Amino acid sequence: TYNLRLEYVQNKTEYALMRLLWQEPGKNLKEDAIQLAQNSDLVILCMGLSPLLEGEEMKVKVKGFAKGDREDIQLPETQTELIKAIHKLGKPTVLVLLNGSALAFNWEAENIPAIIEAWYPGQAGGTAVADVLFGDYNPAGRLPITFYKSMQQLPDYEDYSMKGRTYRFMTETPLYPFGYGLSYTRFSYGKATLNQSK
């Protein structure tokens, strides 16, 4: 828990705003996280992006992001370094992704046994993720977009042919295709029938 002290003075503004935002972790934060992981039975890593990184015309100084434009689709490098360092500890690890767009996380997909895509889950997101992790809720979602392995799988922005665009025209194997999703339950779809009464 953290104690926060907020002071607000009404000036000539019409509104007030407070945000808690992601910032690039410093060296001490990484060491602290590794120390916490060493003393834990299980590690739940919440990684990804924020609207500050993905938003338009944002002033951020993070490698791979330029004023809201993504120069790469990988997780931020500092996050990947932390994930790899914690993975070396040999602790059971769950990766919870928080983002609003597709990410490339090839190493994590191969090495982290449990990954949950939470998107931007809102104020009750922690409870929702906990319900999934503890088995109180059975996840059954499917990806509404394709997750590519790298920028090289994306079609050229200036090429307006359909080759490689969306899951329908992609010939390579993506990291996770449109519609991908796992569940604690096995689902099967049979031959659908329609009883037309009119």
Q: Over which residues does each language-model region extend?
A:
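C-terminal non-catalytic regions of proteins with extracellular/luminal or membrane-system context
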Residues: 1-198
